C-alpha cells in the first residue's frame, strides 16, 4: 500500500521501476498509474515482461545503468518527456551499483518527484511490521550507504526517521529490510 500511496500523491506521468523480479512493486505502480494515466517503465536484467497487462506499461530487459544512457531516446520514441515523477530502486542492493543508479537516474527527476529505495536496512535477520522474522543477507549497508553519499549525510537505518537532507524530505521505515522515500522539497 505504501508504494501505491507514495506514487499516487505526485499525480505521476512517468514511473520508472528499476528491478521487477516477481512484480509486487509493478502491481502497485500499475494501479497508481491507472489513476493518472501515467506510463510505467520497468527495467530488469531478467525477463519479467509477463508481470503486467497495463497498456501503458513497458518492460526493458537490460542493465539499468546502461539503459539510463538511452533513456532520453527511449522517451522520445514513446512521446514522453524524460522527466521521472516516481523512481523506484530495488535491484542488486550493492553499494557501487546503487550509487551509479542514483548518479545516472536522478538527473532525470521531475521538479516534483519521489525516489523510493527498498532494502535500505538489510541484515542477516530482519523483522517485519507484524513482528515476525525473516532471513536476509548482509549487504554491508549497500543501499543506505549509497544514499548517504548521494545526499552528503549519515543515517541510522536501524530506526525509523524523518529528516531533511540536500533539498529532500527523507522518510525511512526500518522494518522488513527498510524502505526509504525521498520527496523533493
Regions found by a protein language model. Give the residues of each.
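S-adenosylmethionine/decaboxylated-SAM
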Residues: 1-185
